[in-house]
C-alpha cells in the first residue's frame, strides 16, 4: 500500500514538474519569439510585440496579398501584416484591441473574406490555447467561449500547449524573417480561369457583432479604418463583397473591392491558387494599393 502511495505521489510530482517546465519554456519562447513565417509567430507579434503606422489584418488572402516592404518604401510609414489563415472575425477583433493597447496606428486595413464572417465549425481558439493567460483580450474571449470545465483544464500548461508545443519550439529553430513584416509570399502560377457564384451571402450574427466592435474601437481611438476585398478568382454577384459594399456605405467606411478588377481576375497567372495572389501578383497589387493608403491618410489630416 505504501509503495502504491509512493508511486502515485511520484507520478503526481513528475506531472507537476513537467507542467511547470512546459509552461515556463512556452512562455519564455513566446515572449522572445522571433518573426518567422509560422501562423503562431504572426499571432504573437500582433498580440504582444509589434507597433506600426499601418496595420494589415485579414485571413490568408490578406496574409499573401499585402507586402509591407513596398508600403514602407513607398510611403515612409512603418507597416505590419498581421494576417492569419483559418480564423474568424473574433480573432481580428482581439488583434485590434491588443494593438491599440500598445500604439495608435494611422491606418488599419481590414481585408474581409466570407469565411471570416461565418460561424466556426469547431473550436476557433484550439491553436491559440498556449497564449491563455498571456493576453487579456484573448483570455477574456476564451473564458466567454468555454465551459467551466474547459476553463479548469486551461489552468494546466500541458493541456494548453498540447496541440502546438511543437510549433512553439519551432519558433526558435525556424528561419527568421523580420524583414517580411508578417507578409508571406507565395510562389507558383495558377492557370484555371475565374468562377462566378450567384449564391447569396449572409453574415453570422456573432461575427457581425465582432466587426461592429472593430469599427467602434477604431472610431473611439480616431484610427482610420479601411475595408478591402483583395483580388480573387472566386467572383460573386450576391456574395460577401456586395454585402460589404452596403455595410460600409451605411457606416461611411471606405471600401475597396478588387474582386472584379480585370487586371487580376482575367490573369490567373498572378495567383498561386484560386483565392491567393502569388508574389508577383502581390507586388502589383500592393503598388496599386499605395494610392489608397495615401488618399485615406491625406483625407484624415
What is each of the regions a protein language model found here?
Residues 6-24:
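Hydrophobic membrane-insertion alpha-helices, especially the h-region
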Residues 26-45:
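Alpha-helical transmembrane signal-anchor/signal-peptide segments
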Residues 53-54, 107, 226:
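Structural motif
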Residues 54-58, 277:
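Short hydrophobic beta-strand that contains or immediately precedes a catalytic carboxylate
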Residues 57, 61-143:
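Membrane-embedded segments
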Residues 86-90, 202-207, 233-240:
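Acidic-and-aromatic substrate-binding clefts and catalytic sites of carbohydrate-active enzymes
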Residues 125-223:
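Secreted/periplasmic serine-hydrolase-like ester/acetyl group-modifying domain
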Residues 242-298:
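C-terminal regions of proteins
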